[in-house]
Amino acid sequence: NRGPAYGLSAEVKNKLAQKYDPQTERQLRVWIEGATGRRIGDNFXDGLKDGVILMELINKLQPGSVQKVNDPVQNWHKLENIGNFLRAIKHYGVKPHDIFEANDLFENTNHTQVQSTLIALASQAKTKGNNVGLGVKYAEKQQRRFQPEKLREGRNIIGLQMGTNKFASQQGMTAY
């Protein structure tokens, strides 16, 4: 739908295209098709563009995440599906800075960010115990609780980084 890019816009478009990883696309395709049972098609971005497969994916990971899947008859239905998916993955635990914008997928402007979001979703799924073959398991917060007496004792200890105070004196010091 967009015309040709010139100047800085063309440079940005080329830089984004260079960051796109076909190997990651294959891994994402295997994961999504395995989880949903639906074939994406030859063109990865076009297969996800209507948002239906994405909503099925999040509903498999967390049932009931998206209540209504719009039949993608018109463009606004497709955009609404993508928007519902993005809201659902945010509630699932994907960080807002990892989430693509609906137009990145719908207008084919930033496929790299779409890949990054799907990898972040796979990582979150792995963290929640799903058997996912890509992404990393996020670390869990380990809360430590110390007794007040132990905390007071720690204030009186001179740390090894501070060295020793055994030979401390003011000998050789002069006033300004």
From Swiss-Prot:
Pfam families: Calponin, CH. The modification Phosphoserine is found at residue 169. GO terms for molecular function: actin filament binding; calmodulin binding. The modification Phosphothreonine is found at residues 164, 174. One of its GO terms (cellular component) is focal adhesion. Smooth muscle, and tissues containing significant amounts of smooth muscle. InterPro entries: Calponin-like (IPR050606), Calponin/LIMCH1 (IPR001997), Calponin_repeat (IPR000557), CH_dom (IPR001715), CH_dom_sf (IPR036872), SM22_calponin (IPR003096). Calponin-like repeats lie at residues 158-176. The keyword Repeat applies. GO terms for biological process: actin filament organization; actomyosin structure organization. The keyword Repeat applies. PROSITE patterns: CALPONIN_2, CH. Keywords: Actin-binding, Calmodulin-binding, Phosphoprotein, Repeat. Residues 22-125 form the Calponin-homology (CH) domain. PANTHER family: CALPONIN, CALPONIN-1. Thin filament-associated protein that is implicated in the regulation and modulation of smooth muscle contraction. It is capable of binding to actin, calmodulin and tropomyosin. The interaction of calponin with actin inhibits the actomyosin Mg-ATPase activity. Belongs to the calponin family. This is Calponin-1. It comes from Meleagris gallopavo (Wild turkey). The lineage of its organism: Eukaryota, Metazoa, Chordata, Craniata, Vertebrata.
